[in-house]
Curated annotation (Swiss-Prot):
Stated role: Component of the COP9 signalosome complex (CSN), a complex involved in various cellular and developmental processes. The CSN complex is an essential regulator of the ubiquitin (Ubl) conjugation pathway by mediating the deneddylation of the cullin subunits of the SCF-type E3 ligase complexes, leading to decrease the Ubl ligase activity of SCF. The CSN complex plays an essential role in embryogenesis and oogenesis and is required to regulate microtubule stability in the early embryo. Mediates mei-3/katanin targeting for degradation at the meiosis to mitosis transition via deneddylation of cul-3.
Source taxonomy: Eukaryota, Metazoa, Ecdysozoa, Nematoda, Chromadorea
Name this protein carries in UniProt: COP9 signalosome complex subunit 4
Family classification: Belongs to the CSN4 family.
Gene Ontology cellular component annotations, sorted alphabetically: COP9 signalosome; cytoplasm; nucleus
A biological-process GO annotation: regulation of oogenesis
Location of this chain's protein in the cell: Cytoplasm; Nucleus
One Pfam family here: PCI
Gene: csn-4
SUPFAM superfamilies: Winged helix' DNA-binding domain
Entry-linked InterPro entries: PCI_dom, PSMD12-CSN4-like_N, PSMD12/CSN4, WH-like_DNA-bd_sf, WH_DNA-bd_sf
Keywords: Cytoplasm, Developmental protein, Differentiation, Nucleus, Oogenesis, Signalosome
Amino acid sequence: MSGEIERSQEVAVIFAQDTDHKAQYEALAKLCNKYLPQNAMGRVDTAEIIKIIDTVIALETGSMVVSRQFVSLITERLDNQHLESECVKAISEGILAIIKTRTISYEDQVCILRLMLASLYEKEGRIKDAAQALIAINSDTSPKFNGPQAAKEGAKAQLCIRITKLLLDCSEIDEAEQYVNRTSILMVDLGANPDIQIEHKALQARVSDAKRRFVEAAQRYYELSATEQLPNSDKLTALGKAIVCVLLAKPGPQRSRLLTLIFKDERAPKCASFELIAKMYLTKVIHKDELEEFEHQLQDHQKADEHGESILKGVIQEHNITAISQLYINISFKTLGQLLGVDTEAAESMAGEMISSERLHGYIDQTNGILHFEDSNPMRVWDSQILSTLEQINKVSDMIVARHSEFAEFLT
C-alpha cells in the first residue's frame, strides 16, 4: 500500500511542478523507464505500471493530452517480443479496465491494445476471447481502420475476415455469418483485391457448410476451386469439399446441376469421393460399405442434423430409392426395406414422403404393401401412353374381327 501511495505522490508531484504538457510527459516517460524501459526483457512489475497509468489518468483533467501520450508510450513498449506475454497481457487488460468509461478519448490506443490481446489469446488457444477482443474494436471511428491507406488495404474487411475465422473456429456460427455478411458489404467499396476476395469466398463457403446449407456451400467451394489465383493443391482441396457438400445436399435442381458440373470436371477423378459422385450422377445404388471411407472425412456438423439424425444416411437412402425406381416397376416394402437397411414401416414412410413432395413418381398400394414406380421422363411417359393406346386399339380391333369376320377385309 505504501508503494502505491509513493507512486501516486510521485505522479502528483510531476503534474504539480509544471503545467507544460511537454515537461509533464517527459517526466512521466522517465518514471516509466524505471518500470518499463524500452526493449525490456522478461518480467516487469505489472502492478506498479498499472498503478502509474491509473494515477496519470485520474489526475489529469481537461485535454488529456499527456495521459494519451503516456498510454501510447506504454502501448508501444508492450509491443516487444522479449517481454513475457503474461506481463503484456496483464498490463493491456489493466489499461483497458482503467479507461473503460473513457474509451472514446483513447480510441487509437484501445485499438492497438485489443489487437495485441487478440494475438496473445489466439496463441494460448483462447479463440473466443480473441474474437471478442477484436469485436470490441470500433472500426468505424478508430484511426487505424480509417483514412486513405486503410481503405486501400481493406483494413475493415480484413478485420471482419479475421473475426469470422475465429468465430468459426469456436463454433459461433450465427455470429460468424453476421461478420461474413458485413464483409460482403465492405467488399463493394473495396473493389478488386484478389487476396481478400479469395479469403472472403472461402469463409462464405465455410459458413454455409457450418449452417448445413450444403447446396450453397458446394456451389461456393466449386467456384473457389475454379479461382485462377489459387495453387492447384488448394483448388483440389476446394473441389473435394464441394464434392462432400453436394453428396450431403438435399435433392433439387441446383444440386442436380452441381452433380453434373462436378461429374464432368476433368479434375474430379483425382478426389477421394469421386466414385460416390459417379454413382449418384448415374443414379446407381450406393451400398453401405462404399460409405465407410467417406464418413471418415465428415466434420461433426456434417454427421448429424439439428435433431441428431444422420445427414448422410438420409441422403443416401433417398438416392437409393430413386436408383431402385430405375430398376423396378414395383417393389414390396419388405424388399425395399432390406435394400435400404431399414424396417418395412420406415421404407414405406420414406417413399410416401418422397411421393408427396414430388421427389419420386409413383403410388403406394397399402393393401398389398407394394410401391409402384412411374416413369418421370416426359418423353418416355408420352411413348408409353401412345403404346398403351395402340395396344387398346389392336385389342378392340381383334374383338370386332372375332364377331364380324367381314371386318377383317376392311382392315386389310
